[in-house]
Regions:
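Glycine- and acidic
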Residues: 48, 113, 157-161, 331-339, ...
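Catalytic micro-motifs at enzyme active sites that drive phosphoryl/nucleotidyl and oxygen chemistry
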Residues: 94-103, 186, 324-328, 420-422
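Right-hand nucleic-acid polymerase module
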Residues: 1-43, 52-76, 80-121, 126-140, ...
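Catalytic palm active-site di-aspartate
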Residues: 112-116, 160, 164, 186-204
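Short Gly/Ser/Thr- and Asp/Glu-enriched loop/turn motifs at secondary-structure junctions
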Residues: 191-195, 230-231, 334, 429
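Helix N-cap motif at beta-to-alpha junctions
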Residues: 203-207, 440-441
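The start of beta-strands in P-loop NTPase/AAA+ ATPase cores
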Residues: 107-109, 190, 241, 337, ...
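Acidic, divalent-metal-binding catalytic cores of TOPRIM
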Residues: 310-507
Length: 507
């Protein structure tokens, strides 16, 4: 079964999503969907709280499958019609606040409107009725009710569920088409990003019909089952700072300078005091990371438009601030030891070994009552972002040498380790461990690292050697003695670490 049109019963629906029929029954009628949720609040930009209802376990997995199936169905409809609407820009692959803002760049007038209590507007009956009556689905009543049961919490689409975004977009398509028709009537461009509606135009005489447009649009929105938040309705002129979904769009797309400066100040407060505020309330480091990531998203977009060079050695001021934050979060203020490995597969092997020997390394790993392993260390995960900001390759031991330079300041712009020691007045919370393969031959990563010029004095080198411990995990004792002799040439001491199943072979 590969299409929604083929679903006639609850069992058909379970087969369609490839979930056991008895599991679907258990979720819906035994444990019941509402029992899978946990609710919490996150701060909004204006200081208010946003309520998040997040599902877990089997229900969350089921919602992910439903969302993916709906997205595939939506794409097939667009393909059949030979079109892809450019109205909605939220919750869709390839679209973002940037693509939404780009439509309204460099316009004479911009009108922003907001739908009040957006997700609460999609109640159980509305969700059920959509899948039962919409021409793209026309599902049986029983199946439509099941979808609403899976998707709703306390009778409404919850903000925080994987299936809520795609369902809200599907239901809003009718509203979007009607609003687009009105927008064209008044010679306006129209886009929607979730609950944010934006209209823009270069038409000089739009002000003459502005009140009629707002009145007609508001009436249509009310008829569609939504409410306009009048406090957020605003018309912005070209000679003012025009913002669309948080981005300035007067000439080029950019982030509000006040937002950038405030983020920089928050980071400095975190570095110097260990804490910071957002809108007067205590905040956490993940929120600050979100702000830096938001700013960087716009820099990335603009970098693609110019012909300048952009890499770890050609960063703008905002990117340098983000790089400093990345170092602080991952290499200075991390709460558990961090292990950096040579290759991508090393982490997989290390985790497998620790899980097998977890009883002998309780300081590194433990197993809880449910049988889940809990690591007390973290493994560094490389990404394109680390390559861009730090010049670290996605694989191989040379990247560790590059990382080490940011601890010494040699061959890079800044010694971040000394910088954070100075401004924080605190020591590094946990160690960073560079884990190399025990290959000291020429052209091997370990040899290159040992030859690295850290830019320190002979006295500092000797202190470093005295404090440095190289722990080797050799295949044989003969191999250990061989590498120990080679390391002695560098003035380094070495110890061996043997796993229990190796000790027999080394006696």
């Amino acid at each position: 079964m590969g299409n929604f049109s083929e679903i006639k019963t609850r069992n058909d629906f379970a087969d369609f999503l490839r979930i056991p029929r008895n599991k679907l029954t258990h979720i819906l009628y035994v444990k019941k969907p509402d029992s899978y949720y946990k609710t919490f609040e996150i701060p909004k930009k204006n200081g208010d709280k946003r309520k998040i209802c997040a599902p877990s376990g089997d229900l969350k997995s089921l919602q992910v499958k439903l969302a993916n199936a709906l997205w595939v169905h939506q794409k097939s409809i667009w393909t059949s019609a030979g079109t892809k609407p450019n109205i909605s820009h939220a919750f869709e692959k390839g679209k973002s606040i940037v693509t939404n803002a780009k439509v309204h760049r460099n316009k004479r007038f911009i009108l922003n409107m907001d739908l009040e209590c957006f997700f609460d507007s999609f109640h159980f009956g509305r969700v059920c009725g959509y899948f039962e009556k919409n021409k793209d689905f026309l599902l049986p009543r029983e199946v439509s009710i099941i979808i609403a049961q899976i998707a709703c919490y306390n009778g409404r689409l919850p903000q925080g569920a994987p299936s809520s975004p795609i369902i809200s977009n599907l239901i809003c398509q009718v509203l979007d088409m009607h609003l687009l028709k009105i927008a064209k009537k008044y010679r306006l461009d129209y886009t929607r990003y979730a609950d944010d509606l934006t209209f823009s135009t270069n038409n000089r005489v739009f002000l003459d019909s502005y009140e009629d447009f707002v009145k007609e649009t508001t009436a249509l929105i009310l008829k569609a089952g939504f409410t306009v938040n009048k406090k957020k309705t605003r018309l912005i002129y070209r000679d003012s700072k025009q913002e669309v979904t948080g981005l300035v769009v007067n000439k080029k797309i950019s982030v509000n300078h006040t937002y950038v400066r405030t983020t920089k100040a928050m980071a400095h407060q975190l570095y110097t005091t260990g804490e910071f505020l957002i809108d007067g309330a205590p905040a956490n480091i993940r929120q600050l990371e979100g702000r830096f990531s938001f700013i960087d998203q716009i820099d990335l977009y603009n970098n693609r438009l110019d012909e300048s060079k952009h890499d770890a050695y050609h960063l703008n001021g905002r990117e340098l601030q983000y790089r400093a934050f990345m170092f602080y979060k991952n290499f200075y203020a991390h709460e558990v030891p961090l292990i950096v490995t040579e290759g991508k597969t090393d982490v997989r092997y290390l985790k497998a070994a620790l899980m097998k020997l977890y009883t002998q390394y309780p300081s590194l790993i433990e197993k809880d009552d449910t049988g889940r392993f809990i690591f007390k260390i973290k493994f560094f995960q490389r990404s394109k972002r680390w390559k861009y900001f730090f010049g670290m390759s996605l694989d191989g031991g040379d990247a560790m040498k590059v990382l080490y330079r940011y601890f010494t300041g040699k061959k890079v712009a800044k010694d971040y380790f000394s910088y954070f020691q100075r401004i924080t007045g605190r020591r590094q919370l946990s160690p960073v461990i560079l884990l190399y393969d025990n290959e000291i031959e020429s052209k091997k990563p370990l040899k290159a690292f040992l030859n690295e010029d850290a830019g320190i004095t002979e006295l500092q080198k000797q202190e470093l050697k005295n404090n440095l411990q190289l722990r080797l995990l050799p295949d044989t004792m003969r191999a250990f003695l061989k590498y120990k002799a080679k390391l002695r040439r560098y003035g380094l001491k070495a110890q061996t670490v043997l796993f229990p199943d190796q000790r027999r072979n080394h006696r």
